Curated annotation (Swiss-Prot):
Keywords: Endoplasmic reticulum, Membrane, Transmembrane, Transmembrane helix, Ubl conjugation pathway. One of its GO terms (biological process) is ERAD pathway. The chain crosses the membrane at residues 81-101, 152-172. One of its GO terms (molecular function) is ubiquitin binding. It comes from Saccharomyces cerevisiae (strain ATCC 204508 / S288c) (Baker's yeast). This is UBX domain-containing protein 2.
Length: 584
């Protein structure tokens, strides 16, 4: 919403009311001190120019009470008496409909075509390649008349305002006719215009360049992004040709703006004050990008300064609720230093509370998102740790189960071997007589047929050691087998003989015990397989270690045939591992 300032008062007008006021000023040329009375006069006549002009020229219009009941807005107090405004966005009912600023297309440099190419005038915002109208030409002309009148009136008013601005900036010392610089019909510079050419040898340009808010090479879209995401003010400055050596083409107005206003110490002091909440975009309209920006904003003459920010704005009166949009907060006055600073200060102070609230909400939103992300990451990490623990627990349980299964299989294989060992074998033919002595001092003698393999001898001795029975009495073997089965049934580290304990307790013969052992082997899906020996047989004189060879019979070993003596020596775990590695 346009704001008109006059001394200690400010008037919030709609765009239509501002146009009416401008037309009234062009017609009557009233002095600036009559502005409050003129606004009151127009309000009392419903902003109708004809009755207001009639009353104005009658001469009896000053001091008239405000019949529309609209109070005059007082200006923002100075810093000494400034009361902190209430933080928060403006009420919805009073949210203005401000002009919206949009970024340039990302590929505007490629899509832009110089005016006059192929006989057409195109811009990057062209929606159609061509336009044709096949209707009545008279109706088409009628459609264009309102737009032509509006453009002409705006052009005439801008012309007069520019004359007044130039006269005020130059201080009235130049009696020559002021020259008004217009935005060119097409950009005249294809390359980037350096800042040194724009500022030239202007005094205090180094102080201006030291501002954190000013980045000479920043693009328009990047400046808009910063203003939008960080809720900063964007000071958009569009100037003309200030660097040309030809005095006929140089934009004197823009040059005076830079020297007298923008680089003035008071301006620099205020810009430093709001440096953290500001982004400055200073470009020359003879370059492509600022030229397109000027076309978007409807800038016809240079210089122009706009203040842009991401505020609550209604794009149209049909919207019930405003939304955050990059909007033009105001076009700053450039006809004098004091008016420029006053207009800039008023707009900044007006919208600063809203931007502060928006920035705080944005910070809180980012913090909440970061906290939520940290919580989600912690939750995912906790789930991952639980999953790893579950996997480790499952592996541990499986490992323990595998150990139990291996131990059970080892016990069942030895029980099966004991059942086979107690079975009678043929005693015909030659036999080897071997005497055994265990590490505990037990001695016993056994006879083996000549075709008995060394592995079978190991198995036979292993059964005696496993049951701790050193005779061939079937009754002793049966009792030892029953005791062993009962021990395994009561052992929690073993998986066998957990069911059918009554059947196990009543079995007394070797055949019954063999049937029970075979059932356990079948239930665990185990085959006979090789036995694991934790001892070795050694012939002492001469010392010779007998290995459990399945392909060598006892009659092939001179130390054992026909008679021999063997020591049963227990193997340590390290010796067993060495033997396994040698076999591999």
């Amino acid at each position: 919403m346009p704001v008109v300032n006059h001394e200690d008062s400010e008037f919030h007008l709609s765009h239509t009311e501002e146009d009416k006021l401008n037309e009234f000023q062009v017609i009557t040329n009233f002095p600036p001190e009559d502005l409050p009375d003129v606004v009151r006069l127009l309000r009392n006549h419903g902003w109708q120019l004809e009755p207001a002009l009639s009353r104005y020229f009658d001469g009896e219009w000053k001091g008239e009470p405000d019949q529309m009941g609209e109070p005059t807005q007082t200006s923002t107090p100075m810093a000494e008496t400034l009361v902190p405004p209430a933080l928060g966005p403006r009420p919805l009912l009073f949210t203005a409909s401000l002009p919206v600023v949009r970024p340039l297309p990302a590929n505007f440099r490629n899509d832009f075509r110089t005016i006059g190419l192929n006989g057409r005038s195109n811009t990057v915002w062209s929606m159609f390649e061509s336009f044709s109208y096949d209707g009545n030409p008279f109706l088409f002309i009628l459609l264009l008349i309102p737009r032509i009148i509006n453009r002409l009136s705006a052009t005439i008013f801008t012309f007069f305002c520019t004359l007044l601005s130039l006269h005020s900036i130059s201080g009235g010392g130049n009696s020559g006719k002021p020259k008004i610089s217009k935005v060119p019909k097409a950009p005249t510079r294809e390359t980037h215009i350096p800042l040194a050419e724009i500022l030239g040898d202007t005094k205090d340009k180094d102080a201006f360049c030291e501002l954190k808010s000013f980045k000479p090479d920043i693009s328009f879209n990047e400046a808009l992004r910063i203003a939008k995401e960080e809720f900063k003010f964007m000071l958009l400055i569009l100037v003309g040709d200030t660097y040309d050596t030809d005095t006929d083409t140089v934009d004197v107005n823009s040059k005076l703006l830079l020297e007298k206003i923008l680089l003035n110490k008071k301006t620099l002091q205020y810009l430093r004050k709001i440096d953290n909440d500001l982004i400055i975009y200073l470009k020359c309209v003879h370059e492509l990008e600022p030229w397109l920006v000027a076309r978007q904003l409807g800038v016809r003459n240079t210089p122009e300064i706009f203040l842009i920010a991401n505020v609550a704005n209604k794009a149209s009166h049909s919207e019930t609720l405003p939304s955050q949009r990059l909007s033009i907060l105001g076009k700053l006055k450039v006809n004098s230093l004091n008016r420029f600073l006053q207009s800039l200060t008023n707009v900044v102070e007006k919208y600063t509370p809203e931007l502060v609230v928006n920035k705080t909400e944005m910070h809180e939103l980012r913090m909440s998102r970061e906290i939520k992300k940290l919580q989600e990451d912690a939750y995912k990490k906790s789930l991952e740790m639980d999953r790893i623990k579950a996997i480790e627990k499952e592996k541990s349980l499986k490992h323990a189960q595998d150990l139990k299964l291996n131990s059970t299989a080892r016990q069942l294989k030895w029980l099966k071997a004991c059942i086979d060992e107690i079975q009678p074998f043929e005693t015909t033919g030659k036999q080897a007589t071997l005497q055994f002595r265990t590490s505990s001092g037990k001695r016993f003698v056994k006879k083996f047929p000549s075709m008995t393999t060394l592995y079978q001898i190991y198995q036979s001795i292993g059964c005696h050691i496993y049951l701790a029975v050193y005779s061939s009495d079937p009754a002793e073997w049966s009792n030892a087998l029953q005791d062993k089965i009962r021990q395994l049934s009561a052992d929690d580290d073993m998986l066998c003989f957990k069911e059918g304990q009554l059947e196990t307790a009543t079995a007394t013969t070797i055949e019954e015990l063999g049937h029970i052992i075979n059932n356990e082997l079948t239930s665990f899906d185990l085959e006979r397989g090789k036995l694991e020996f934790d001892f070795e047989l050694v012939s002492p004189f001469p010392k010779y270690t007998v290995h459990p060879n399945e392909h060598m019979s006892v009659d092939q070993v001179p130390q054992l045939w026909p008679n021999g003596s063997l020591l049963v020596e227990a193997l340590d775990e390290e010796d067993e591992e060495d033997e396994e590695n040698e076999e591999q």
